[in-house]
Curated annotation (Swiss-Prot):
Signal peptide (UniProt feature, chain positions): none
InterPro entries: AriR
Gene this chain is encoded by: ycgZ
Protein name: Probable two-component-system connector protein YcgZ
NCBIfam families: YcgZ_fam
Annotated organism of origin: Escherichia coli (strain K12)
């Protein structure tokens, strides 16, 4: 029973996170990341989203791309 509560809380948090992504490009990026996570057979969570975003940030080639990923990471902690 407790695990269902945690899962629902996590799902709600992820839904709120997506709602905060106001730019279409942010939503596209989040969609790509979610697809990657699910295709890998992993659970979708803040931790998995953050890990993917940090990986992409590390491999970002330009300042705009870095700002984009930093903004998305920031949404996780609002």
């Amino acid at each position: 029973m407790h695990q269902n509560s945690v899962t629902l809380d996590s799902a709600g948090a992820i839904t709120r996170y997506f709602a905060k992504a106001n730019l279409h490009t942010q939503q596209e990026t989040l969609g790509e990341i979610v697809t990657e996570i699910l295709k890998d057979g992993r659970n979708l969570s803040r931790k998995s989203l953050c890990a993917k975003l940090l990986c992409r940030l590390e491999h970002a080639t330009g300042e705009e791309e870095q700002k984009h990923y930093n903004a998305l990471i920031g949404l996780l902690f609002e």
